[in-house]
Amino acid sequence: MDKNKHILIGICGGIASYKSVYIVSSLVKLGYKVKVIMTQNATKFITPLTLETISKNKIITNLWDLDHNEVEHIKIAKWAHLILVIPATYNTISKIASGIADDALTTIISASTAPTYFAIAMNNIMYSNPILKENIKKLKTYNYKFIEPDKGFLACSSNALGRLKNEDKIIKIILNEFNQKDYLKNKKILITASRTEELIDPIRYFSNTSTGKMGFCLAQEAVKLGAQVTIITGPTNENDPEGVNIIKIKTAMEMYKEALKIYNKFEIIIGAAAVADFKPKHIFNSKIKKNKINRLYIKLVKNPDIIQHIGHNKLKNQIVIGFCAENSKNLIQKAKEKLKKKNLDFIIANELKYFGSKLNKVYIINKQSIKELPEMEKSEVAKEILKILY
């Protein structure tokens, strides 16, 4: 644990503000250097003197507390190795998402490149507001991180989603951020992701419901661990992960050709794409008119199996990981068969029902063992999968 890290705590105005005292106190006791910014509304719930005593630093409550001769807001933004906003309110989240910097907290966040966490706490109706959801989604694309609230009793007397996550869990999340190591430093990883689209005519195609989220989570987490990542992706609505070289394709053949051109340059290949098994043998030159056809027969031909080709042609020190999606009844058996048939080092087995979901439940399988993971967010699944590489 690196005790030389600096943590900036931003406290917003909400009934959960008082819980920040425990978090600041705990981080100081652990040896971290902690500074606190409070919004004006936060000072209505808890006194700055309390936080000043605990943090052993002057509390900033507005821009005029800063020494402008030193461009202090920039100095503090650079000082922070991590920013935690707690409780993150509807107002503050929305201001940051809109690029508004009208107080000390929003100004410093706007000038910082440090990992920034928003620990959300608010009324359940406010939390479900679509405007807030869009703002959170927007901020996530810029790598802001969110500690989602729990269900519990709220200030409005409702028992609903919106209660600040347990303080010890928040502290654990912060410590995990600092404890990340470059376990995959300079490792070259190739990942295939999302679905492919096989044209029937100029506007219609065969495809599936894969979103690419699992592959993109793997790419993002691998970058955090120091890897050099290239992702070959089919169509997706996922945001491009930062620090990743991205190759975009549409069809299975395009993915196959791109993968074969470069896979021997990588130490690790992960086939997370849901590649179409078949494609139309012929593509209609123009849109098919239903008024001219009573029955339509389309002859299909097999697409090449990308990960199988790589598995059987891998270099001596390459690790090849595949994915297998099946119904739960035959999942493990089918995965074992594919592991052997495709000459893979590992295969990740998951049920079909998780296609298009933010969650996943997988089994990590190799020749010697089967590791079952509980249902969890795909970003967490990605972390667990990557652990097999170090």
Swiss-Prot record:
Cofactor note: Binds 1 FMN per subunit.
Binding site for CTP: 277, 287, 304-307, 323, 338, 342
Cofactor: Mg(2+); FMN
EC number: 4.1.1.36, 6.3.2.5
Keyword vocabulary terms for this entry: Decarboxylase, Flavoprotein, FMN, Ligase, Lyase, Magnesium, Metal-binding, Multifunctional enzyme
One example GO MF annotation: metal ion binding
Catalysed transformations (reactions): N-[(R)-4-phosphopantothenoyl]-L-cysteine + H(+) = (R)-4'-phosphopantetheine + CO2; (R)-4'-phosphopantothenate + L-cysteine + CTP = N-[(R)-4-phosphopantothenoyl]-L-cysteine + CMP + diphosphate + H(+)
Region (Phosphopantothenate--cysteine ligase): 189-390
Family, similarity comment: In the N-terminal section; belongs to the HFCD (homo-oligomeric flavin containing Cys decarboxylase) superfamily. In the C-terminal section; belongs to the PPC synthetase family.
Function: Catalyzes two sequential steps in the biosynthesis of coenzyme A. In the first step cysteine is conjugated to 4'-phosphopantothenate to form 4-phosphopantothenoylcysteine. In the second step the latter compound is decarboxylated to form 4'-phosphopantotheine.
Name of the protein in its database record: Coenzyme A biosynthesis bifunctional protein CoaBC
Source species: Borreliella burgdorferi (strain ATCC 35210 / DSM 4680 / CIP 102532 / B31) (Borrelia burgdorferi)
Gene that specifies this protein: coaBC
